[in-house]
Amino acid sequence: PDRNYTSLKKTIGEYCHISPEHIVVGNGSTELISLLISQRQAKKALVVGPTYSEYERELALTGGTITEYNLKEDLNFQLDLEDFFASMAEDVDLLILCNPNNPTSSAIKNRDMKHILTFCNERNIFVMIDETYVEFAPDIAEITAISLTDEFDNVMVIRGVSKFYAAPGLRFGYGITSNHEFLEALLIHQNPWSLNSVAAYAGERMFKDNTYQQTTRQLICSERDRMYMAIQNMPAFKAYKPYANFILVRILKESLTSF
């Protein structure tokens, strides 16, 4: 394939309404997460959890300190910005967010993410946002931080096609950042041709398939709402408002289990 993936980046840029120069593609979002963490070499990283365990596994390989900020169940796993900012240690230099989050299916709205990026920018904290599930959100524009990457250079948004496009075997992910210096560092350390030609070809077709995108979103949003309301009406369960394609449920009846 084209070593620079010029055509693919152009298609992604049109899909995300962003400059192709801000895009890096990789062998799944996992490769890009690993690259970002290894290149940032964070002395102290903060992970908002509970969340995907791969972040901490990659962080452990760099030898830095890993800290956690846990979302609170009594707030329905929605982030309390005031408490979050107050509890953040001064020496944190990398913040990792999954948005919408796995496994809580909660989400940080774009307006709150802007406050987070401003707060972090003032403290030289780089932010990684994993948006693997964002295309399932009821309103993508309300959640995605891609529009903020032009304004802030202390952030990289990472996405993949495994979930929304049901194509985990392609191993295709992409990242977006306006930090050209960091982007160059990623490209220098990334293996050449890390994305195979089949994935590059399929990626271009995926992002242009408006029919699939609309049909899938309509189905997921409709079924999610139906399931959420049904579970809410069951006294033995408590469901938390979902933004992804899954619902976190607490079992309230002691005699019941998840099996």
Language-model regions: role of each:
Residues 232-238, 246-259:
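Conserved C-terminal alpha-helix-loop-beta "cap" of PLP-dependent enzymes
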Residues 78-91, 103-127, 131-164:
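Active-site pre-lysine segment of PLP-dependent enzymes
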